[in-house]
Amino acid sequence: MKKTLVVACALAVAGTGAALAQQKGEKKMSADAQRGRYIVQIAGCNDCHTAGYPESGGKVDEKLWLTGDKLGWRGPWGTTYAANLRLVAQKLTEAQFVARARSSELRPPMPWFNVRDMADGDVRAIYRYLKHAGPAGEPAPAYVPPDKEPAPPFVQFPAPPKK
């Protein structure tokens, strides 16, 4: 009898939590979106595309994930900023997102070649996670050419060694 009561209470609490999440307008994450969330974490996407992520040891509210950063990355290529991927995904279809992952050669320090070499299913899963997360934040600052001085803060990369 006690076991039945404990199970019934657990189910009631779980059902209440699910109902409250539904009332708040939170939608259930699909298996593909969950996989995309996992890939985002293990591939290090948050390291640059989520402000404060590395500094906090990854303790940034998920509502802020992948909203870009105002920290610039300055080197011989100019100054680049990590894009707000949640806004980028809102502007693209899934097919366009995959095509961009395959064809874009982005400026450093973005490891575009890692994204290019991901399996289509992984890129699609990331897209589905971004769509699930929805739009948030502001667009990243615009690229600054090498001959222009960027506004701080930025990380200064040294020039490559001369050959």
Regions from the PLM with identified roles:
Residues T16-A21:
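Sec/Tat signal peptide C-region and signal peptidase I cleavage site
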Residues A8-G15:
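Bacterial N-terminal signal peptides
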Residues D47:
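Short, cysteine/histidine-rich loop/knuckle motifs that typically chelate Zn2+
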Residues M1-T4:
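Positively charged n-region of N-terminal signal peptides that target proteins for export
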Residues R86-V88, A99-A101, W112-F113:
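A structural feature that tracks compact, well-ordered secondary-structure segments
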Residues R37-A43:
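Local sequence-structure signature of Cys/Sec-based thiol-disulfide redox active-site neighborhoods
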Residues K24-A31, I42, T50-T80, A95, ...:
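Flexible coil segments in periplasmic/lumen-exposed cytochrome c-class electron-transfer proteins
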